[in-house]
């Protein structure tokens, strides 16, 4: 039986989030609605999650000493990584020592912190279908890994840093002239300085989806796996622009997608939500990536599901029942900063909300960049295409000024 103490009391149930952006903010809100005391951690002040948590902390989460000192001082019941750039070896050590429970597990946080760990697990350990790939530690290695005459992945292909966020550093290559530029772009977009990339042969897929996969306790107290309806999405430069739910799939493709998602998440273990990214070509499904946390494309669930992805995550990690039922078809569209400024102002909010059956989420980020995600428009409709048009219309009516 799950018990939850009163926040700010000696018996409080305390949860620490490592990473307090827009996704972490929504997880914090979901936890607070269940009476949990929250600690929001990020590398900069006034992050979105800092603005609503009981406690806000600023550290370098890649610094093992700072991370250990904070966790030992705060003594949370659960530590929930919300980003990849964390000293995961420290989390593994603290979990082994019995200091704290990491969500979903410290091993999962380590394996998914970079594209090499999770790709090797999926393709080489679990034998799941993926695009052809190689890992490279220099420009020369990258050129050799692509060269089709030497058994490389050939063109077109995609180059990504081993660790990056929101598509940073990713590029598609159509020929040899693109290689050096792609290497430099990957190095600039990487969150760490290990100078390694993954190059993937291009999969000529029909569409790509995120399959939100939830591991939560069932009625018998054992962990069960359940799935949300498939989420379709469109990306630009590796970054999500819009998403919609449900995305139509054949029964065969859906079964394959669920099999792949179940295989990966069961191996990673623990409880919580996982965003499993998949490419689909006909009935063939290819594994791409997995995040052991809510997914940016899953923000659409804030308008489509009875329990959105953040509520599902909060419930699952606390040992509470979950419900992945779809409430309505819907869509999300990103609101970009469009300006380089701090303390921006949002205009046109009233105009945006006049679009039928729409909602807005403005993230409260303290600084805007041209392509920074500052908010999201949500729309529901029985027809997905109508929802997509309305979400895009609402997002376009919001203006950001410095």
Swiss-Prot record:
Residues 120-318 form the ATP-grasp domain. Gene3D superfamilies: 3.40.50.20, ATP-grasp fold, A domain (3.30.1490.20), ATP-grasp fold, B domain (3.30.470.20). Pathway: Purine metabolism; IMP biosynthesis via de novo pathway; N(2)-formyl-N(1)-(5-phospho-D-ribosyl)glycinamide from N(1)-(5-phospho-D-ribosyl)glycinamide (formate route): step 1/1. Keywords: ATP-binding, Ligase, Magnesium, Metal-binding, Nucleotide-binding, Purine biosynthesis. PANTHER family: FORMATE-DEPENDENT PHOSPHORIBOSYLGLYCINAMIDE FORMYLTRANSFERASE (PTHR43055:SF1). Involved in the de novo purine biosynthesis. Catalyzes the transfer of formate to 5-phospho-ribosyl-glycinamide (GAR), producing 5-phospho-ribosyl-N-formylglycinamide (FGAR). Formate is provided by PurU via hydrolysis of 10-formyl-tetrahydrofolate. Homodimer. This is Formate-dependent phosphoribosylglycinamide formyltransferase. The lineage of its organism: Bacteria, Bacillati, Actinomycetota, Actinomycetes, Mycobacteriales. The gene is purT.
